[in-house]
Amino acid sequence: MCLPRHPAVAYLFLVRPLSSHVSILRTQSVIRSPRQLDAVLVVGVTLLCIAAPLVATNAAIAAASGIVVLAVLAWFKRCPAAAPLSIFCVICLSLRFSGVRYGPVILAFGLLGYAGVVRIVSWLRRTATWARWGSFDASIRLLCVVAGLLSGAAVLSWYLFLHPNIPHFVKAYVPALPLGLLIVGGLIWAMLNAALEEAAYRGVFLHALDTSLGPGFPALLLQALAFGAIHIRGFPGGWPGVGLACIFGLFMGVIRRRAGGMFAPCIAHVFTDVVIAGIVLLLARPEV
């Protein structure tokens, strides 16, 4: 091919078409990058939330600081999945480090902050599409029953065969009241705790992961790991408790996706929490 010798002609012949192609590539990269950044931030926040309960205090503070940095970046870049998720996590971790130890209270305030953000901030409105009842047909009901029975049996087996030492748990959470009142309180706790944990992990976490990564297994696994990690000091606790809670989180995530809403996983979760309340009130209390 014969190239033009005059510089101006050469510019028009070669450089200008090339610059237009570069401009197109840059535009395409900018169009794609916000979603990619959103996914990276969501995964980063989730991984730090998984690590924070499992490591020493100094490392947990570092993980929390990392979440704050990612939250600032998510808000600066207006990431629709990472921004509300990071706010929820920052609120929960702030309460935890400030001395609040009761998990449902932490989750409740975190969810209130999340709800306020997605309602007030204009570019986040109508992003919390997970907050719906969903289906509860025969197949979903069967899944709930199977998941509830399996998880309840797993928790009971954990208590009966591993003989965990949980007097501190009973002393901290079970007041000195008549058994009848404790049973009523246990049922109320089971419903509230199930609703809060499902809203947090199958709602806030799974929704952010699904919308940024896509509704595949990685999103399902990450939310289950985050759910399992917070049970390191819960009931069931320790690493066996983390494993059981992680498997349970996978079950609940599948049910939430199949049902397309929150009612079904909440019902299945209540079954398991009723078993936990029964163990604490009827088997683990020193008075019994």
Question: Regions from the language model: what does each represent?
Answer:
Residues 22-64, 208, 212:
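Alpha-helical transmembrane segments and their cytosolic membrane-interface
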Residues 34-51, 83-92, 146-152, 220-223:
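Alpha-helical transmembrane segments
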Residues 52-123:
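Alpha-helical transmembrane segments in multi-pass membrane proteins
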Residues 101-109, 181, 185, 211-223, ...:
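Membrane-interface starts of transmembrane alpha-helices
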Residues 106, 115, 120-193, 211, ...:
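Juxtamembrane helix-loop-helix connectors linking adjacent transmembrane helices
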Residues 193-202:
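Acidic (Asp/Glu-rich) catalytic motifs at the cytosolic membrane interface
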Residues 195, 217-230, 234-288:
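Functionally important transmembrane alpha-helices
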